[in-house]
A protein has these predicted regions:
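Metal-dependent DNA phosphodiester-chemistry modules and their immediately adjacent helices/loops
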Residues: 1-9
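Common nucleic-acid-contacting/processivity interface regions adjacent to the catalytic cores
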Residues: 16-133, 209-265, 269, 288, ...
Length: 329
């Protein structure tokens, strides 16, 4: 904002401030309110919270609770299909389950590091494996592990989806969680495209009225797509919470371990590709990885491509941007 709170450091405490300089104390509080109002104009956080509450049909304070928000969203979805939600059962989270994959960073100083992340990883895993309370089978796969799946030691020929923790899910019906994930993701995609289009049009606006209208469109569409993004990303937090009506450790671990498979598979493929391009053997170009992101050392790649040629930072950035979009993505 380029602004800050009014200074009152000469007073020992707020009581001293209040009693010694009443007029300045009033101005201080008015300025604080104006700062909050300016922050809201710029950040739209209150508007975002209202959007989330309205969309999920919850009270405003409930948007800070993943469990309550998702419980209400699922209730509304199932009610619309004439499905009665199950009663809440008290559960204890005595057993720990595996979390996300984090690769120990390779220490060093690197030039030309790029990062990639898997788009909405956990929601997509829920859709990919049809992870949902009513699709989970009682029978577990006897030998499924992250390493065995990555090493292709297991074949999946059955009529169910198999996750890395051995949890198996029906294929003959589509679970309500994957359906909701798909709908929310599709809606987010639509409004994100509208936001980007409005931003593009804003750059070409010629009148104050047009500029104001487009600014409102950007804010509106951004709030809607951001609300959908938060809903998607908070789903796993609810699924792994023992107080969630649909909590099941198998579902939570199916998501995290399948996420490990995905990010490690991407890591292996990136290393294999760069080893082939640079004619190296078993070199590790992924210097760090965490949950759904990898950090790739493209310094050797840049050195090989620009060897003996004049180069500038701008030309390298432009080249890497194109290569990352065309080859790696």
């Amino acid at each position: 904002l380029g602004d800050k709170k009014l200074d009152h450091s000469e007073f020992e405490n707020f009581k001293d401030f209040y009693t010694s300089d009443w007029q300045r104390f009033v101005e201080y509080n008015i300025h604080d309110v104006n700062l909050v109002d300016s922050l809201e104009d710029k950040m739209k956080l209150i508007e975002l919270a209202v959007t989330m509450a309205y969309d999920a049909k919850v009270n405003l304070e409930d948007v800070y609770s993943q469990v309550r928000m998702w419980d209400t969203m699922i209730f509304s979805d199932l009610k619309g299909r004439n499905i009665v939600v199950p009663p809440r059962i008290t559960t204890k989270k005595d057993d720990k389950y595996a979390g996300a994959y984090v690769k120990e960073p390779i220490p060093g100083s690197y030039d030309w590091v790029v990062s990639f992340d898997l788009n909405s990883l956990y929601p997509h895993l829920i859709m990919q494996y049809n992870i949902s309370p009513e699709t989970l089978l009682d029978e577990r796969h006897p030998s499924a592990t992250v390493d065995r799946i990555l090493d292709e030691e297991i074949t999946f020929d059955g009529d169910c989806c198999v996750c890395a923790n051995g949890a198996q899910y029906r294929k003959d019906i589509l679970g309500f969680l994957p359906q909701m994930m798909q709908r929310i993701y599709d809606e987010r995609t639509i409004y994100k495209k509208r936001m980007l289009a409005a931003k593009q049009n804003l750059e070409d606006a010629t009148t104050p009225a047009e500029t104001l209208a487009l600014q409102k469109d950007v804010s509106k569409f951004n709030n809607i797509q951001m609300a959908r993004k938060i809903q998607l990303n908070s789903a796993y937090g609810a699924i792994g919470n023992q107080y969630f009506r649909y909590y099941n450790l198998a579902n939570a671990e199916a998501i995290t371990l399948s996420g490990q498979v995905s990010i490690r598979w991407i890591q292996n493929k990136m290393n294999a590709y760069l080893n082939k391009i640079l004619r190296t053997t078993d070199a590790d170009y992924v210097i760090a990885a965490d949950t759904d992101s990898i950090y790739l050392n493209l310094g050797p790649f840049v050195h090989e491509v620009f060897k003996g040629r004049e180069k500038s930072d701008e030309s390298i950035v432009g080249f890497l941007d194109k290569v990352c979009q065309v080859e790696f993505e």
